[in-house]
Amino acid sequence: MRVAFDVIVVGGGHAGCEAAAAAARMGAKTALLTHSRATIGIMSCNPAIGGLGKGHLVREIDALDGLMGRVADAAGIQFRVLNRAKGPAVRGPRAQADRALYRKAMRAALAETANLSIVEGEAADLRIENGEVTGIVTADGRALSCRAAVITTGTFLRGVIHRGKVTMAAGRIGENPAIRLGETLEARGFAMGRLKTGTPPRLDGKTIDWAGLDRQAPDPDPQPFSTLTASIVNPQIDCFITHTTVATHKVIRDNIGQSPVYSGAIGGRGPRYCPSIEDKVVRFEDRNSHQIFLEPEGLDDDTIYPNGISTSLPEEVQDAFLRTIPGLERVAVLQPGYAIEYDFIDPRELKSTLETKKLGGLFLAGQINGTTGYEEAAAQGLAAGLNAAARAGGGAPILFERSEAYLGVMIDDLVCRGVTEPYRMFTSRAEYRLSLRADNADQRLTGAGLKWGCIGMERSSAFRTKMAALQHARGLLEGFNLTPNEAAQHGLKINHDGVRRGAFELLALADTSLAKLQAIWPELREIEPSIAEQIEIDAKYAVYLDRQKRDIEAARRDEALLIPDSVDYDLLTGLSTEIRGRLRQIRPRSLAQASRIEGMTPVAMTLLAATVRRVGADSN
């Protein structure tokens, strides 16, 4: 069979764009199959990238030469670092984006990607031979051959839009859903469910009374997502803050029965951490107000995205409650809000590569795996694209551990625990978050990316230059030291134990900055500012990271205890029916992964460990 493509990616959203670009960077002849070129890179919901936990994912995507960080930098019109007053481990870079600029930059980035073709059409069926995907069949009957395929359907998989009693089949407002592909996947026996998400009404900024609203300014020193972005060139704009009122809540309560979520029309679970305004009013009935961020959708666009009031109430009810909100008394609605319900596949159907267990060569990424958010989708797309290309080329799987990336945390959570509601990334999900900071994503991942072959020449050169500069700076610091008495003469407070301390160790002190040390040793002034900032962060965390390193090494020992594919869980006596069923379904690759399965007990882990050791001994 002549293979037209090595990898076919279905869908041109955030997951699909990253998957296609990643596969192509790996050298795979790649096709991005999308309904329309014009919709590639669309921001379907909020016009923003990053945030707490999410910003870490964007930096990790960038560290592996992905697109989202660079595209967000090209489109960003308000950059802010969330949690700036807290430690670097939990700071979240975020950017408000110009929708038009984002789509333009994403399409340009894909156009510049070698080995990548854009194909218009709707994926309708899979070609399967001997339990493996060999191609995609489009709705108009074209057969596209491939060695691996990545499905990134977002909310399109049998999507249905709800607004009051009005329903329509759609993947996004004004766009057809993927009905036949959903039927194909269901017919193949995948465990599927329904989830829902929502979006707020879009407002005409010219009809908003901005006087009296709180202003949210951008950071004075915008921090790019990408290490390849020298500076942010777009004008930076303000956002504004308003709030719901008692009158708003009364309108919503009086009409709650018209919400499809509360009328029973929608059965899918929505995202807990991004609830609709109806959910907020019902769940937090003691609150008289909820914050709303009025976010401009572009530099040359008067459309305003009111972040915080997604809704599926009827259009006339939306109009009524909007007019009870300060500043929106005479607002014109450009597009009413709505909820969308869609199919997802239980992510426990997946390996840690995001390849399905049922069909070889079929990878899934994004909302089809039960996640919510652009960043979560894009990160999965990157992982799926890398692994699809590796499989197509006969290479080894590319795995991300919990101890090395938020991407590893997310994938492990999905494939081990599954989802009952849309999954969102938070820093609190990572047990090693002191190591997994947004500022060191390149130090954690770019070296691995170079080995895998997904890093381009520009990033490779920039990374090597940065690492050399960091090494030089550390070398400079190691060349200077002080006794406690000498340190005291310079105003540095350390224990008077007679022990000399090097400059890097001194930098770890809470009240010591590199500027103080540069005053003592002027030679340190040759360290450039960006490297100096990184060195300071590394020094402040050094003691804690040394402790965490031991935990990580212990975890990696457990990860190295692999469970052979040949293990028959039905033959293991002493396991409960529930645990046996979960082990059969998930088929964990290691003892460490098995320990994270919901409901796993110490007794079950002991039995499993004994089995692994016995099988290992027999094989030797």
Swiss-Prot record:
It comes from the Bacteria. The gene is mnmG. This is tRNA uridine 5-carboxymethylaminomethyl modification enzyme MnmG. SUPFAM superfamilies: FAD/NAD(P)-binding domain. Homodimer. Heterotetramer of two MnmE and two MnmG subunits. Gene3D superfamilies: FAD/NAD(P)-binding domain, GidA associated domain, C-terminal subdomain, tRNA uridine 5-carboxymethylaminomethyl modification enzyme MnmG/GidA. FAD binds at residues 11-16. One of its GO terms (biological process) is tRNA wobble uridine modification.
